[in-house]
Amino acid sequence: ADDFKRFALEMGGKSASVILSDADLAKAVKGTVNNCLLNSGQTCTALTRMLVPAQKHDEACELAANAVAKMTPGNPLEETTRLGPLASAQQRDKVIDFINIGIKEGATLVAGGPEAPEGCDKGYFVKATVFGNVKPDSRIAQEEIFGPVLCVIPYEDEAEAIEIANGTAYGLSGAVWSADDAHAKKVAGKLRTGQVFVNGGDFNPLAP
């Protein structure tokens, strides 16, 4: 190279939360929803794809809908607010477009939708939205929405879960949930992503 330049990149993501069959489903879904909706979904490491065993899909969707219902939208300065606005009108419109795309793609609208939350007339608010039965190759499962939208994707076995988790252009973050920490770490090692949270653990920026 003729020269070197210093620069920093703000990377995007479509991070997968892989919930294995032996995981505490309620804990895993709650942890995934909380992560996904942090900063109203405007987080590069947001767990926006939740992969669940097919036989637990409906239960996981119900748990996610219940968790989302507790995310009260409103003024970020109010103590009761759990979900603030998006950064701009342009971003709000983009997220709403993706919600409509998800509906047209045939995903099941479990919670939320394209309408503004009730009582949030001022500000760029979008309802926290959960889609079920999302196809891994659909646009809402492949493209970064950067808003409060969670895609629940069913899988048949562990190998398929890993394949789906790795099946995007992104590789920023991810999560694995299992009753067996050692097995969770083994699965985490198969995810092609920069960092993986195991059973809700977080990284420590002070760690070497």
Predicted regions and their residues:
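A structural signal for short, well-ordered beta-strand elements
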Residues: 21, 88, 151-156, 177
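Short amphipathic alpha-helices within nucleic acid-binding modules
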Residues: 157-166, 181-189
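Short, conserved phosphate/pyrophosphate- and ester-handling motifs at nucleotide-, phospho-/glycolipid
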Residues: 53, 148, 180
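ALDH superfamily catalytic-core signature
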Residues: 1-135, 159, 163-164, 198-206
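Conserved glycine-rich beta-strand-loop-beta hairpin in the small C-terminal domain of fold type I
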Residues: 81, 123-126, 143-149, 168-172
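Terminal low-complexity tails and localization/encapsulation signals of metabolic enzymes
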Residues: 113, 181-208
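Cytochrome P450 core scaffold surrounding the K-helix E-X-X-R motif
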Residues: 137-142
